[in-house]
Amino acid sequence: MDKSKRPFRKSKRSFRRRLPPIGSGDRIDYRNMSLISRFISEQGKILSRRVNRLTLKQQRLITIAIKQARILSSLPFLNNEKQFERTESIPRATGPRTRNK
């Protein structure tokens, strides 16, 4: 059978294995803010294990470290640094309010 007759055969592509996000020398600790901040989203949420590419044990340790840092106020619970641009303000009607019944 020649190669043109194999419709379901996928070509083999070489892939490069990604490096783990936590090296062997990195210590997972609530004081290591440079490490912890890599696993938090823009809103301040803990990213999932699938996104982080961590092992189960590493994800558990990261989660505990983030929660400890939040309790000790070295990390905010929410990151609400949203920048709103103010456009022209619309004047409100200052008359009496009417209720819709």
From Swiss-Prot:
It is found in: Plastid, Chloroplast. One of its GO terms (biological process) is translation. This is Small ribosomal subunit protein bS18c. HAMAP family: Ribosomal_bS18. Coiled coil: none annotated. Residues 1-19 have a biased composition (Basic residues). The keyword rRNA-binding applies. Keywords: Chloroplast, Plastid, Ribonucleoprotein, Ribosomal protein, RNA-binding, rRNA-binding. It comes from Ceratophyllum demersum (Rigid hornwort).
